[in-house]
Amino acid sequence: MIYIIGLGPNDSSNIKENIKNLLLNNTSAKIIARTKEHPAIDFLEQNNILFETCDKFYTESDNFENTYNNIASYILEVAEKNDVMYLVPGHPMVAELTTQLLIKNGKNVKVIGGESFLDSCFNAAQFDPVEGFTLADATAPETLSSVNPHNHLLIT
């Protein structure tokens, strides 16, 4: 089983209690974080929770598509022998390509959501997304040609 778990957009104060409990009470799943470069990782370190990261894949690949494909392949390989808790920043279903790859190629995948970075962005910019907004991928600049200039724009 692969559990894709969202750590929220910033420090451990935004990790949901059910997720904290899953991590603290884990006895058998291998914990793999997409990156150590996220403030919520401190929660794992402060609680002596063993984990590894996928940071090496960022230096081994020359583009994000290859990086995320390699991460997903690695998670799927590990999941053949162990349950995996794969930790991602924010919410697993928001701007997280590895989630889509794992859902598409995995057998048993469960998504456990955390707070999305979008919540913080909407709050900081003080607008309601129902007013209209576009979320664009900075690695795919061709998508910017279809942006509605009357909508709020967030480029990730």
Regions inferred by a protein language model and the residue ranges of each:
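Short glycine-enriched loops at secondary-structure junctions
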Residues: 36-39, 90-92, 115
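Beta-strand/loop-alpha-helix module characteristic of Rossmann-like adenine-cofactor folds
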Residues: 2-5, 10, 22-24, 29, ...
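Glycine-rich, flexible N-terminal cofactor/catalytic loop recognition
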Residues: 1-58
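Glycine-rich, highly charged phosphate/nucleotide-binding loops
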Residues: 63-75
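Short, charged, surface-exposed secondary-structure boundary motifs
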Residues: 14-15, 41-43, 60-66, 119-123, ...
